[in-house]
């Protein structure tokens, strides 16, 4: 019989059992990486953030109180790591802009990490704002409840529902206009 996530967490916390934590990583790494790839649109960056997520989870495992699912707790860490990476990237972009203004040419661009996301999904998600896209991916692609998405993103459940409604409406208007009732 396989141990539950909660049993593995307990073993990892009480005995610092790396094998138990390794099993947790094995169970959840695909979901975390997939979500981060949808957020970042860059597989290499997503994998880096996923690695940071699991390191942080190991360090903070003792803080998981068992309220809610381990997967939701892990996704919250992944989202926080994503936001930290985003802030760092924005700061680097401001620095690159300053360098370009100073020397009159843009810094060398590294074209590695081209997106491998399915074109149709990317087109659908491309019409959404950041918050709508993040919420839609969490609730539909990752299968989390509105409550879990609320906890991960630090948004009220009503806001989560509003983002989903607006996101669906934008997709419907853009890609399925014949289904929109005319008044």
Where are these regions (language model features)?
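N-terminal module of bacterial RNA polymerase sigma factors
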Residues: 1-26, 30-31, 38, 126, ...
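Short, basic/polar amphipathic helix motif occurring as a linker/hinge flanking DNA-binding modules
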Residues: 2, 75, 85-116
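Sigma70-family region 2
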Residues: 13-14, 41, 52-69, 88-90
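Short helix-capping/turn signature of helix-turn-helix
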Residues: 27-30, 38-41, 137-145
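Hydrophobic-face residues of short alpha-helical interaction/recognition segments
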Residues: 32, 36, 61, 74, ...
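C-terminal edge and immediately downstream basic/flexible tail or linker adjoining helix-turn-helix-like DNA-binding
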Residues: 41, 93-94, 114, 118-127, ...
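Structural recognition of an alpha-helix C-terminal capping motif at a helix-to-coil junction
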Residues: 48-55, 68-80
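Helix-turn-helix DNA-binding module
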Residues: 123-134, 138, 142-159
